[in-house]
Amino acid sequence: MIEFRNVTKTYDTGTKAVKNANFLIEKGEFCFLVGTSGSGKSTLIKLILKEEEPTSGNIIINGKDTTFLKPNRVPYLRRSMGVVFQDFRLLPDKTVYDNVAYAMYIVRATQRHIRRQVPMVLSLVGLSQKAKMYPHELSGGEQQRVALARALVNNPSMLIAD
């Protein structure tokens, strides 16, 4: 599902965020990546999402080498992933419902499917009663659950949390 083959990421400053990473995460596996602050955990996620390019090595996602993936194909790669970012990346001027629905709008889901799916995932994360609230009205834990609901709403093949 996710494979790194001799992946190195060196930033323009000369900082090596990732050095010769080799690993394979197969379908159905649950993987934790732990390390100190600045050890490259977020960089690995950015590499998986193609927000960053490796300096060397190959990254294989769902059996496809992303090394030569054209920029216009990156959104399709990302659709197979649900991502909860460290900073949640919620839209401050949108309700909880709309923050979750936004992930479905992007993939052009029908309004009918959105109306059915969003309440279901909000219930799953215990936020049904908060659907009309805005991010600033929620606790940090509730904001995190909105981000989780948004990551799950399109039934991704993998869930990545930073």
Segments predicted by a language model, with ranges:
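Helix-to-loop junction immediately C-terminal to a conserved catalytic motif
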Residues: 49
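Conserved ABC transporter NBD signature motif
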Residues: 57-65
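Short helical segment in ABC ATPase nucleotide-binding domains corresponding to the A-loop/adjacent helical element
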Residues: 97-105, 115, 119
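Conserved ABC ATPase signature
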Residues: 134-138, 142
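Hydrophobic anchor residue at the start of the ABC signature
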Residues: 148
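A short, proline-enriched helix->beta-strand linker immediately N-terminal to the Walker B motif
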Residues: 153-157
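Catalytic Walker B motif of ABC-type/P-loop ATPase nucleotide-binding domains
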Residues: 159-162
